[in-house]
């Protein structure tokens, strides 16, 4: 999972990718390529460890990118996370990926699986190559096969290599990404109009289970609806933490991504309407005013296990600052939840170790666009009134 600020827009990026793909499919085959925005998170993580000094295919080279996705796809139909599908593969790279085909590991983390399925279907429509549709179908089968029966979400990774990876996961679009994919398939939106009616019906049933689960997972404080945790026990559906520094909490960033998805539903049910309104009100109630997050350059670069840092971060009092949100909020009292890798909660941002302070996003402006623009527009579309109850003009 990532705390990187470049992925704050959550499902908006996925929607942008889908829109760009639809435009590409409407034009001459292969003229402009297909959007690769959906792979940004994977590429970011790949380059964090390996740098960016390696040859990459041009974004317009659809066949080369799709062929890489075929090469990276495991025999079970899924993919491991954090690979760059635009990488120009050496003979050694190809040999290694072929040798890994039979390995069991796969992951839905960091916008994985649903992005590959969409790209491969787009490549099929553009090129007519049946192997791309077949690979997308295997990927979809993998996604459907790993949907929890107890509640229609997905685990972080299969098989789990750490305790948190077996949990039902909302973080990093592990939930909202597949739901968006399933909705687009069930509604036969391009490029998924190339799927048959049986596949669309299967996707629609999985979508219904997923949306029902999503509403069940929304955290309540008494009778008040709030946001969503990052992970849950798949049997009891109790909120849980992730990695050692990701304690059990309501997660503002993931709540925004979930709301982006729920607000995309054309004709929402009363339950969805109540869910969106409750979560938006909670986000407004927990916003932090009078503070800004400042980046401070370091005299020398600091090397850590998972990243190198040329800066530190600090919270600075500023009466004119835009609202901030803590990433994590206490389920009981909505106080910000901060912690170190040892799993110990701390009270202040400056008590977080520099490695986690620079390698994770503890504060951000995640809900600003949603509250200022997207939620009011949704309210007018669905309810016909402003937040003050006045008719929309």
Q: Which residues fall in each region the model found?
A:
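Bacterial N-terminal signal peptides
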Residues: 16-26
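Long, well-ordered core segments of solenoidal/helical folds
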Residues: 64-77, 135-152, 204-223, 275-292
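N-terminal carbohydrate-binding/catalytic regions of secreted carbohydrate-active enzymes
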Residues: 59, 63-114
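Eukaryote-skewed repeat-based solenoidal scaffolds used as protein-protein interaction platforms
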Residues: 133, 137-140, 144, 158, ...
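Terminal, non-catalytic domain-edge segments
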Residues: 32-65, 184-209, 235-242, 246, ...
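Bacterial N-terminal signal peptides that target proteins for export
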Residues: 3-18
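Sec/Tat signal peptide C-region and signal peptidase I cleavage site
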Residues: 27-31
């Amino acid at each position: 999972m990532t705390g990187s600020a470049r992925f704050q827009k959550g499902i908006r990026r996925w929607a942008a990718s889908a829109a760009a793909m639809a435009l590409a499919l409407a034009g001459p085959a292969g003229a402009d390529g297909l959007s690769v925005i959906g792979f940004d998170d994977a590429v970011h993580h790949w380059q964090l460890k390996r740098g960016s000094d390696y040859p990459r295919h041009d974004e317009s080279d659809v066949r080369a990118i799709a062929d890489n996705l075929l090469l990276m796809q495991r025999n079970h139909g899924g993919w491991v996370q954090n690979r760059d599908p635009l990488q120009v593969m050496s003979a050694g790279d190809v040999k290694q990926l072929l040798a890994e085909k039979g390995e069991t590991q796969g992951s839905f983390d960091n916008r994985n699986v649903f992005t590959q399925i969409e790209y491969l279907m787009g490549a099929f429509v553009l090129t007519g190559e049946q192997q791309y549709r077949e690979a997308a179908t295997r990927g979809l089968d993998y996604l459907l096969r790993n949907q929890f029966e107890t509640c229609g979400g997905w685990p972080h990774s299969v098989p789990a290599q750490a305790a948190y990876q077996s949990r039902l996961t909302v973080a990093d679009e592990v939930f909202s990404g597949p739901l968006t994919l399933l909705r687009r398939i069930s509604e036969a939106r391009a490029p998924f109009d190339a799927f048959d009616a049986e596949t669309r019906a299967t996707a629609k049933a999985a979508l219904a289970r997923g949306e029902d689960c999503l509403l069940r997972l929304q955290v309540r404080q008494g009778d008040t609806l709030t946001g969503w945790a990052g992970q849950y026990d798949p049997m009891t559906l109790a909120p849980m933490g992730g990695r050692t520094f990701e304690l059990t909490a309501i997660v503002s960033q993931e709540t925004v991504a979930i709301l982006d998805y729920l607000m995309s539903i054309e004709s929402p049910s009363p339950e969805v309407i109540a869910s969106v309104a409750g979560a938006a009100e909670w986000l407004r109630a927990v916003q932090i005013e009078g503070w800004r997050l400042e980046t401070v350059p370091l005299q020398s670069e600091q090397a850590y296990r998972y990243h190198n840092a040329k800066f530190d971060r600090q919270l600075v009092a500023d009466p004119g600052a835009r609202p901030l949100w803590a990433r994590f909020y206490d389920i009981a009292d909505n106080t910000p939840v901060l912690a170190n890798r040892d799993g110990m909660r701390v009270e202040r941002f400056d008590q977080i170790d520099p490695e986690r302070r620079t390698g994770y996003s503890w504060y951000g402006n995640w809900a600003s666009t949603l509250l200022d623009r997207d939620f009011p527009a949704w309210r007018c579309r669905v309810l016909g009134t402003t937040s003050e109850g006045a008719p929309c003009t």
